[in-house]
From Swiss-Prot:
Name of the featured protein: Speckle-type POZ protein B
Renumbered residue ranges of the record's region Required for nuclear localization: 71-191
PANTHER family per record: SPECKLE-TYPE POZ PROTEIN
Pathways per UniProt: Protein modification; protein ubiquitination
């Protein structure tokens, strides 16, 4: 009977991460063998389909599974009449079923295994069920004395059986010192400073509303704020900054980005937020707005987005808008936005025409390239 091996130490199981707890599953397999010798084999007069059975055998005295070998000396049926058929039969079983693999071979005059055949998987046995090989070996080859498979007219069959038994789980806790590094919460913590107005040292005034902020954070994130506070400007002396041309809700979203690197409402105000990001040199936020606007390009708004991109030097957005217009040229040129742009921004109309004229091949579909973020 196979022995359940001790599991390897958890640290040796893998060169990858080490878990706090582990489980090692061992599938128990009982292996045993059986040898069956048939004397005077050449005198077997059984007809096709007739059977010779061995005595029963098991893995040991306490094993209630009983097996036997079954031979059809002249084959099982018409298809195998020129062969010896060999099967493993489950004679008795206290369980509803068992699974087992098996290997058959013939021992030659030297006691060596020859003509071995093995099951490719563990088969399901129930009591009275057999599995094996209908064409185990050709009769003419077996009976040919030159092949030495019937010394003294004895056929010796050797069978190895592997019976699958229950699985065993061994589990435990890792004894190694585990150091758990907490996730970085810098974004949330800085966002908390903004939301709670703690330890502020400057005031930002937007359309009559006042917002408390931190000069160091503003200066670190925005070159424009940095210039305000670094030089002897009025904003630096009074610690008060007047924010113009930005609506309060857009300003709050911009400040959320400055403190956390996130802008959860960006899709709702991408156009206005693009203008604010451009004004305060927030390059990553600017490209995030460009990407959001690109994903919402349509025939109706293509001209307006092209104007917006040109106004705020949003080069990637501008390229995407021009490409979109080229692809949908006939439809876009019928919109009120395009007709208005012809009057207000003729240079953009010229750029769009130049791009259309220089196109070497038609577009396969509307451009939706992912933008590069700073």
């Amino acid at each position: 009977m196979s022995r359940v091996p001790s599991p390897p130490p958890p640290a040796e199981m893998s060169s990858g991460p080490v878990a706090e707890s582990w489980c090692y599953t061992q599938i128990k397999v009982v292996k045993f063998s059986y040898m069956w010798t048939i004397n005077n084999f050449s005198f077997c007069r059984e007809e096709m389909g007739e059977v010779i059975k061995s005595s029963t055998f098991s893995s040991g005295a306490n094993d209630k599974l009983k097996w036997c070998l079954r031979v059809n000396p002249k084959g099982l049926d018409e298809e195998s009449k020129d062969y010896l058929s060999l099967y493993l039969l489950l004679v008795s079983c206290p369980k509803s079923e068992v699974r087992a693999k098996f290997k058959f071979s013939i021992l030659n005059a030297k006691g060596e295994e020859t003509k071995a055949m093995e099951s490719q998987r563990a088969y399901r046995f129930v009591q009275g069920k057999d599995w094996g090989f209908k064409k185990f070996i050709r009769r003419d080859f077996l009976l040919d004395e030159a092949n030495g498979l019937l010394p003294d007219d004895k056929l010796t069959l050797f069978c190895e059986v592997s019976v699958v038994q229950d699985s065993v789980n061994i589990s435990g806790q890792n004894t190694m010192n585990m150091v758990k590094v907490p996730e970085c919460r810098l974004s949330d913590e800085l966002g908390g400073l903004w939301e709670n107005s703690r330890f502020t040292d400057c005031c930002l005034c937007v359309a009559g509303q006042e917002f408390q902020a931190h000069k160091a954070i503003l200066a670190a994130r925005s070159p424009v704020f940095s210039a305000m506070f670094e030089h002897e400007m009025e904003e630096s002396k009074k610690n008060r900054v007047e924010i113009k041309d930005v609506e309060p809700d857009v300003f709050k979203e911009m400040m959320c980005f400055i403190y956390t690197g996130k802008a959860s409402n960006l899709d709702k105000m991408a156009d206005d937020l693009l203008a604010a990001a451009d004004k305060y040199a927030l390059e990553r936020l600017k490209v995030m707005c460009e990407e959001a606007l690109c994903s919402n390009l349509s025939v109706e708004n293509a001209a307006e987005i092209l104007i917006l991109a040109d106004l705020h030097s949003a080069d990637q957005l501008k390229t995407q808008a021009v490409d979109f217009i080229n692809y949908h040229a006939s439809d876009v040129m019928e919109t009120s936005g395009w007709k208005s742009m012809v009057v207000s921004h003729p240079h953009l109309v010229a750029e769009a025409y130049r791009s259309l004229a220089s196109a070497q091949c038609p577009f396969l579909g509307p451009p939706r390239k992912r933008l590069k973020q700073s």
